[in-house]
Design a protein with these regions (language model features):
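An N-terminally biased module of ancient metal coordination in phosphate/nucleic-acid-related enzymes
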Residues: 1-74
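Metal-cofactor-binding active-site regions of metalloenzymes
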Residues: 2-17, 61, 71-92, 104-117
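Acidic (Asp/Glu)-rich catalytic clusters
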Residues: 12, 64-73, 95-101, 166-168, ...
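Active-site core of metal-dependent hydrolases
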Residues: 24-30, 54-57, 76, 82-86, ...
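Histidine/acidic-residue-rich catalytic or RNA/ligand-binding cores of hydrolases
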Residues: 29-33, 61-63, 186-191, 211-217, ...
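Extended substrate/RNA-proximal surfaces in nucleic-acid metabolism proteins
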Residues: 74, 87-203
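Short acidic/histidine-rich active-site segments
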Residues: 253-270
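Mid-to-C-terminal alpha-helical segments outside catalytic/metal-binding sites
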Residues: 274-308
């Protein structure tokens, strides 16, 4: 970790009280840099407000509740990710996660129809995500994880997708679009609004499997969705700071926020992620007020309406 850059004191102060809405902590089936409790303790030391635990494979609301008990100064929030490990588009899984205190529902990630890399035979030497290695290992062991559809062949959301959206609306949870493709994102967002979902966030819109243009991002922001720009993907060289900042300038900062998406052992410490991003934004010419909105205020506005 000593090889990673250190955030400035100015950036640390600007992100004080922030929520990181997308982190990968242990225990997990994929190796992580810290466990939930260690992460909460580090957030407390840095004056950060809270974080959402993401697992591609299991609900995290129970882990979050225990972490809040042990580190009450930090609001640790749980979630569920609708991959095959929880039954895919499974409204019962969402209902149980909500009753256990979950704050956020990610739509499919590793099992999204839009993410075939984990279902294809691996290409020797290819640079693939950590989770894709897990998918390949499972297939080698005869455990098949098929794609989770959210729309039909005509692009209309499936009945089970609407049932999930109704459960999200009922419990006032946050909907995150995860690894859906562009057309799926628009279909799901429009259906979510029809079903009464109040909080929607578009997960890493610049990520190659989403690749939303600036006009697309603006159209989603006009619908009331937040745009979650993730820092880990920049470190993994999936896209650049310049692209993200250009898109934010196009859409305006009101519906944009940054999350780290950190927790991978090769990456910077989770608790440094937002401050490192704030330093980049300052260097790119954003004002302190704008940086505070992008890295703290907007994520708090999204998170503080959640039940946990």
């Amino acid at each position: 970790m000593s090889n990673h850059p250190q955030p400035s004191d100015r950036a640390r102060e600007l992100v004080r009280g922030a929520y990181d809405m997308h982190v990968h902590t242990g225990p997990d089936v994929i190796r992580r840099i810290n466990n939930d409790i260690e992460t909460a303790q580090r957030f407390r030391e840095q004056g950060l407000g809270g974080f959402v635990i993401k697992s591609h494979y299991a609900p995290t609301s129970g882990r979050a509740a225990l972490t809040r008990y042990l580190v009450p100064e930090v609001r640790t929030m749980g979630a569920i990710c609708l991959n095959q490990a929880v039954g895919g588009m499974n409204p019962l899984a969402v209902e149980m996660a909500a009753r256990e205190g979950a704050s956020l529902v990610w739509f499919p990630t590793v099992d999204a129809e839009n993410e075939p890399v984990g279902r294809r035979p691996p290409v020797p030497g290819a640079n693939i995500p950590f989770w894709a290695h897990m998918q390949h290992q499972l297939r080698d062991e005869g455990v098949f994880s098929e794609a989770v559809p959210v729309v039909d062949e005509a692009g209309q959301v499936l009945p089970e997708t609407r049932a999930v959206l109704r459960s999200i609306a009922k419990h006032d949870l946050i909907l995150a679009t995860a690894h859906l493709n562009r057309d799926e994102i628009f279909a799901v967002v429009d259906a979510a609004l029809e079903e009464g979902v109040k909080r929607i966030t578009i997960t890493h819109p610049e990520f190659p499997s989403q690749n939303l243009s600036a006009p697309d991002q603006a159209a989603l922001a006009e619908r009331g969705a937040f745009l979650e720009h993730t820092i880990a993907s920049i470190y993994f060289q999936k896209y650049s700071w310049e692209l993200v900042f250009d898109n934010i300038r196009y859409t305006g900062i009101e519906q944009c926020y940054f999350a780290s998406d950190l927790g991978q052992p090769s990456m910077p410490p989770i608790e440094d992620g937002l401050a490192l991003g704030a330093d980049q934004a300052l260097a790119a010419g954003f004002s302190e007020t704008e940086v505070r909105c992008l890295f703290a205020d907007n994520s708090r506005r999204l998170a503080e309406q959640s039940p946990a």
